[in-house]
Every structure is written in C-alpha cells, then in structure tokens.
Amino acid sequence: MYDKKMEEAARVVMSEHPHKRVLPFTYNNTSYFIKRCISNGRNRFAKQNAHMAYLTEVYKIRLVNSRVPLAPAIVLTGPDYFVMKASGRPLQRIVKEYPEDADEAYYKAGEALARLHSFGLHHGRPALRDIAWDHVTRAITFLDWENEMQFFHVDARVLDLFLFIHSYFREGWPGSHL
C-alpha cells in the first residue's frame, strides 16, 4: 500500500544526495535502499541506458518475486526511483564480516540460483557483490536486476552459472572447494 510519508522521507534523502544512484534509507526503524534512474557511468558498451535499466530492473524484480522470493521487496515506486527493503550484506563481504557463515552463504547462493533457474528465470549477472546474505534469517537475495544485455546465443541460465562461478574465483573466496 502506498505510504505518502515514506515517499516524502525518500524525497528528502534524494534531495540531500542529488547525484547518488543508490542510497541507504531508514524509515520507521527499518532499513531500505533507494535506487534511482541514474547511470553509474560504467561499462556503457555492455549496459543499457539508465531509463531502460531502471524499467528492466523494476520489471524483473516484480516478475521474480511473483514466482519465488529471491529479489528485494519493492515497497515504493516512483517515476525515476524505487525503494526496496534491505536484504543483508553482499557475499563478497561475508568472508571478512562473518567468516563462519562463508561456506553456508555461498552454498545457499548456489541453491538459490538453481531455484531461480528452475522457474525458467535468470539474473543476468549473479556476481558475489550482487547477492546479499542476511546473517540473521540466513536468506539469499539477488540484487541489481538491470542487466539484460545478450552477447552470446546461449541459455541465459548457463551464463548466470558461469558468471557466478567466475565471481567466486575473481573475489578470491577462501578454500579450495565449491
């Protein structure tokens, strides 16, 4: 349900940081993130323009969550931003912040990716920085759903798996097992 006070509070935060694309935001003692329709300026060859990326992300998050709860919950949508519930820490930080959780978190991320794929869906770039681990609930949430560029004529789920494993090695995840 629409929350006018939340929208007003989000607009204040955005006005204080007019050029930031992603902003942490606390409202009624709950953590959220505001994601705006602003280019991050990286890899323009491989990424869509900011408006298409925004529309793609909102659509994919809603599509995924209508089937399996593996994307952040969007609680407010505006014409050029949305507010989503915070989902934990990125997997790339888990080794340092919760080393005792590292194996479980990575394993559950793999299970979650397989579950997503079992619904015929794909993420587009499941790098460890785009996968959140909630230390308390032990839940996995995939972030950053705006990537939808196709360079290869392969099943997008295969590319997801390749990028997930590649990210494991790129981040230097400890241990010699997957």
Where are the model-predicted features located?
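ATP-binding glycine-rich loop module of kinase domains
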Residues: 7-55
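Active-site beta-strand termini and strand-to-loop segments that position acidic
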Residues: 24-30, 85-86, 134-135
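Protein kinase-like catalytic core scaffold
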Residues: 32, 70, 82, 139-141
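Conserved structural core of kinase catalytic domains
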Residues: 38, 50-54, 58, 62-65, ...
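Conserved protein kinase catalytic core
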Residues: 41, 91, 150
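Conserved hydrophobic alpha-helix
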Residues: 64, 112-116
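Catalytic-loop of the protein kinase fold
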Residues: 118-130
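C-lobe/activation-segment region of protein kinase-like
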Residues: 134-135, 141-178
